[in-house]
Amino acid sequence: MSTDILRKIEAYKREEIAAAKARLALDELKARTRDQSAPRGFLKALEAKRAAGQFALIAEIKKASPSKGLIRPDFDPPALAKAYEEGGAACLSVLTDTPSFQGAPEFLTAARQACSLPALRKDFLFDPYQVYEARSWGADCILIIMASVDDDLAKELEDTAFALGMDALIEVHDEAEMERALKLSSRLLGVNNRNLRSFEVNLAVSERLAKMAPSDRLLVGESGIFTHEDCLRLEKSGIGTFLIGESLMRQHDVAAATRALLTGAEKL
């Protein structure tokens, strides 16, 4: 996403946040988070797959995107969550942004309730209020996009997530962002292979940035991963965890496609 697009997204997000705060005071929202069952352990689920010698997949539930338009016409979050779990995914990522991705909070809640997988709120966060929102909807993890926040806000979002028992996936797409991300506490680092200015996708981005990460960090490859061969290529750089959405969302048999991606097994 170009800087201009990120600016537009931030503008409408700040309007959304102001409207949400007017509807529901922070104290009331915090009370709702206390009504939720405990977080399921997002990072823990990924590490368990890797420890078992398997690829760890964060499988994304995404109806549409700004660049591709409608991706999945027959969009059924609970059915997709069950299919991903059956196919061997470790975690879910659910889009909750409406203007750009046709996402919704209820998609996250419904998907998580339909399976036993931990779920990420995939959205653009600019205020700790949104972290409390995410937890109140059932999310186990938040996304912090370094391209869209400064260091102070990134730390504030991360601290809020940790205080709620959640994990934080820190997303970077270049060396400068990786250096900033490494100052945070989260061990979960996502490398977006999509150039945020040109939209080009290149797995070499993950291969390059992986060299900067200490061994205690869990690296997640994002964007441009379509096949088992892509997974094997990134594994050579120490990346065995992936966030994949569009390529699986377009498949008729999502469970079989997920299994094929993770294991190399032929789709039935």
Swiss-Prot record:
Catalytic activity field: 1-(2-carboxyphenylamino)-1-deoxy-D-ribulose 5-phosphate + H(+) = (1S,2R)-1-C-(indol-3-yl)glycerol 3-phosphate + CO2 + H2O
Any Gene Ontology biological process: L-tryptophan biosynthetic process
EC numbers for this chain: 4.1.1.48
Keywords on record: Amino-acid biosynthesis, Aromatic amino acid biosynthesis, Decarboxylase, Lyase, Tryptophan biosynthesis
Keyword presence, Lyase: yes
InterPro entries in alphabetical order: Aldolase_TIM, Indole-3-glycerol_P_synth, Indole-3-glycerol_P_synth_dom, Indole-3-GlycerolPSynthase_CS, RibuloseP-bd_barrel
Gene3D superfamilies named among the record's database cross-references: Aldolase class I
The UniProt record lists the keyword Transferase: no
GO molecular function, one term: indole-3-glycerol-phosphate synthase activity
NCBIfam families on file: PRK00278.1-2, PRK00278.1-6, PRK00278.2-4
Protein family per UniProt: Belongs to the TrpC family.
Protein name: Indole-3-glycerol phosphate synthase
Organism the protein comes from: Brucella abortus (strain 2308)
High-level lineage: Bacteria, Pseudomonadati, Pseudomonadota, Alphaproteobacteria, Hyphomicrobiales
